[in-house]
Every structure is written in C-alpha cells, then in structure tokens.
A protein has these predicted regions:
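Extracytoplasmic beta-strand/coil segments of soluble accessory domains associated
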Residues: 72, 76-117
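Soluble periplasmic/extracytoplasmic beta-strand elements of cell-envelope proteins
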Residues: 35-40, 54-59, 64, 74, ...
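Short, solvent-exposed loop/turn elements at domain surfaces
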Residues: 45-49, 109-111, 182-185
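Short, basic and Ser/Thr-rich N-terminal targeting/leader segments
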Residues: 33, 95-97, 105, 315, ...
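Extracellular/periplasmic catalytic domains that process cell-envelope and extracellular macromolecules
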Residues: 31-32, 103-105, 166-167, 222-223
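Structured loop/turn residues at beta-strand edges in well-structured enzyme cores
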Residues: 32, 104, 128, 136-139
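Surface-exposed beta-strand-turn/loop segments characteristic
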Residues: 73, 77, 90, 116-132, ...
Length: 439
C-alpha cells in the first residue's frame, strides 16, 4: 500500500512538470507567410498600446472640437508641454512659435511633420518654428517624451513632437473662424489697487480679435494609386495690451502687501557729491522739481503698454502628393510656404542712473530757470564742490561768491515717454520642399 502511494505521487508530479514546459513547433506546423516587413528608426509608428516608450496622441476629433487657430494651442493642453515663443511673448520675442517639452528647452525638443524635421525659424535659435504647421491640416499629434534621443540624437533629449497631416484627402473644404477676447475686468482686488494709485481702470473690454480662413482640396487618381492635396490658410490677429486687463493695468510691487508701482527711473535726478539735497528729486509734468516721496505717479507703469498678445498676420500655403509607380515604389512630394508678420511692443527705453556732466554756470542750475522756483528743489543745490576747509559748497553758492565755473556731475534716470514704446517688427518667410521615393 505504501509503495502504491509513492508511484501515484511520482506520476502526478511528472504530469504537472510536463504541463509547464513550453511547446515546440515541428515540421508538421505550417509556415507563417509575411507579405511585408517595415523597419523604421522612428518609434512614433507604434500605437500607444504597444509602444515601449511613453506616447501621447491628440486626434483630429479633439483638435477640431477645440477650434484652435494656432497649432501650438493644440499641444499646449498637455501638462508636459510648454510653449516658449507664442503671440503672448513680447519681451524677448523672436517672432516665432516654439515648443518646449518638460521644460528642458525648445532647442532640445525635436519637431517633425510626417516624420521629417522642421527647419529652425529664427537665425538666432535652432528651435523649430511651428508656425509652418497649419492647424487645419493636422490629422493627429504624436508626442514621445522618453528615449527619443537614442533614435534622433541630442536635439531630442526632451522628446519628439510629430505632426501627422491629412493624407488622401478628396473633395473641398472651406473654414472661417472668428474669435475675440471679452473681459469684464471686475476683479475687485485689482480695482482697489488701481483706485488707490489713481491708475486707469480699463472696465469691460473686447480686444484681440482674430480671423482665420482655410481652404483644403484634394483629388485621387482614377486608378487609386495616387493623390494630390492643396491647402491654404490666412490668419489675422489684433494686438492686446496690458492696460486692456485689470490684472495688467498696473505693475504690482510688494509680496505681502502688493501695490501698484513700476519703475523708479522716471524723471529723476540725484546729486553725486557732498551734502547737497538729500535723496532723489522728481520732475513734475510742469517742470517743477520736488523731493521724491515714492508717490505712485512718480513710478513708471511699464506693464500697461506691454503686449499681452502680439498682432499677427500669417499665410500658409502648401501642396503634397504621392503616386505608386510600382507595387513596391512610391514617389512623393511635400511643399510648404509660410510668411509671418508680427510686432512686439514693450515699455519705453530708459536711462538707468546714467551720469552726466555739466558746468556750475549752466542755466539749468542757476536762478531764473522755471525749475528753480523758490518753493521747489533747485538743481544748483544738488551738486557742487568742497572748499579749502573741506566744507561742501553748492553750485549756486559757488557761483554767487564770484568763483569760476567748475565741472559737476549728476545722476539722471528718465523714461523716453516722448519717443513712445519700443516696437520690434518681425517678418519670417520659410519655404520647405521634400521630394523622394519610398518603398
């Protein structure tokens, strides 16, 4: 009985082990026939289900539902995408639109159209200009943020953004889109700050109007072996300034108790020697010089004149096509032209504590000048020299004593409000053409 139990257990273990061994295919199995094998260096061809790297896709349905006019707005909805250069950038603008994955820099983000690299958009940067990509032509967007540099090189350290355009389109489409920005500007906190500083309150505004027209047409060959697609888009977008929003109508200063302020380099003078008039003096609009007290209107509100949104006029024209020459060879082409005009406005230029020299007998320093009123601050008291005893003597006292004129120095800070804001205009024109055979 004991021997029988051992034999039964042995057969049971053997059967269990055999069931876990892998099966092998022998000669009687049918061979698998592969019609086509495609080897590619791009991991973007894999779906987000089978891809071995993180892949995010934005489809045509989501793109159309958002109604965006600019292609950078298509991907800006993702948390790992930062838009470095857009129409909202004024100070430091390049007149282009660039993408920045994971905040590692736009020069480390590779941008492709149908797997082909985009050219850079500015002579001062190697970053790709996505203004060349018309939003209406985008079928989907593939974004890879890991392992891309192993395939594409160091310019893909942050990742790859691949815009897949519409293929084999047949028919005619015309789209027109109009948008505007309306804001009630009813932020109570900002209204109080603007009121305390006696700054302009914009009230309700409608600004930043934008129009977008696009045409898309395509035709397939009669034999079904080829297609030609043409497209054209025109965009016209108006400017929007900081003063058009209550949150931008003044420059906020202070962290714990903010107040409307700005730059103090605004019609200021400083003496540079001895014990002249203490501190800084400010020139009122009527020319009178008064002590600088930090009054709100003694600061220059540079935020109000900066662009919130730059004006943009853009043309995109292009054509693409393909034709199967044989079962294994296909000819294709892709051409795109883009012309983009924009302007970036920032605050007036300024002299920041710039020294200048003059003589003590300068009429600006002596009596009789309207700035030297009896109740105000006199420039002649702000600077001077030292006598033989080492005591300070102002220019006015020095000249009143019958001495010869001497050279003196001032520190001046001034905003060039007379010359108007600084405006930089940009015009970028790019033509891209690709021809080839594939099979």
């Amino acid at each position: 009985m004991k021997s029988f139990n051992k034999s039964y257990l042995s057969h049971a273990v053997a059967a269990a082990v055999a069931s876990t061994l892998p099966g092998f295919a022998f000669a009687q199995d049918e061979e698998a026939n592969l019609e086509e094998v495609v080897v590619t260096g791009s991991r973007l061809t894999k779906s987000n289900v089978t891809s071995s790297v993180p892949l995010v896709q934005i489809g045509a349905e989501e793109i159309n539902s958002r109604g965006v006019a600019r292609v950078e707005d298509v991907v800006n909805i993702l948390p790992n995408v930062f838009v470095s250069q857009t129409a909202e950038v004024a100070n430091g603008a390049s007149g282009t639109s660039t993408l920045n994955l994971r905040g590692l820099g736009s020069q480390r983000t590779l941008v492709l159209i149908d797997g082909k690299r985009l050219p850079f958009g500015s002579p001062f940067s190697s970053s790709a200009n996505v203004d060349m990509v018309p939003a209406r032509m985008v079928e989907r967007v593939d974004i890879v943020t890991s392992g891309a540099s192993a395939v594409y090189g160091s310019d893909a350290v942050a990742g790859v953004v691949n815009f897949i355009t519409k293929k084999d389109f047949e028919g005619f489409e015309f789209d027109y889109q109009y948008s505007t920005n309306y804001n009630k500007n009813s932020n109570g906190y900002m209204e109080n700050l603007l009121g305390e500083a006696d700054f302009f309150d914009p009230g309700s505004t409608t600004t930043g109007e934008a129009s977008l027209m696009s045409v898309l047409m395509g035709v397939n060959s009669d034999d079904g072996r080829g297609n030609i697609t043409l497209f054209g888009t025109y965009e016209d977008m108006e400017e929007m300034l900081g003063k058009d929003r209550d949150t931008g109508a003044c420059t906020l200063f202070g962290s714990s108790d903010p107040f409307c302020g700005g730059s103090s380099n605004f019609r200021r003078f400083n003496g540079t020697i001895g014990n002249g008039v203490a501190g800084t003096v400010f020139q009122e609009l009527n020319g009178e010089l008064v002590p600088f007290t930090g009054r709100s209107d003694m600061y220059y509100n540079y935020g109000a004149v900066n662009h919130y949104q730059r004006p943009v006029e853009r043309w995109n024209l292009g054509a693409s096509g393909h034709y199967e020459l044989t079962e294994n060879v296909e000819a294709y082409f892709d051409t795109t032209y883009m012309n983009n005009k924009t302007a970036a406005q920032i605050a007036e230029s300024a002299s920041f504590n710039r020294p200048f020299f003059t003589n003590c007998d300068n009429p600006l320093l002596l009596g009789g000048n309207p700035n030297n009123n009896p109740d105000g601050v006199r420039l002649g008291d702000m600077t001077g020299t030292f006598d033989a005893n080492g005591d300070f003597v102002s220019c006015l006292d020095w000249m009143a004593a019958g001495n010869e004129s001497i050279d003196v120095q001032f520190i001046n800070s001034h905003r060039n409000v007379e010359g108007g804001p600084r405006v930089s205009t940009y015009e970028n024109s790019t033509w891209r053409a690709i021809f080839g055979l594939r099979g």
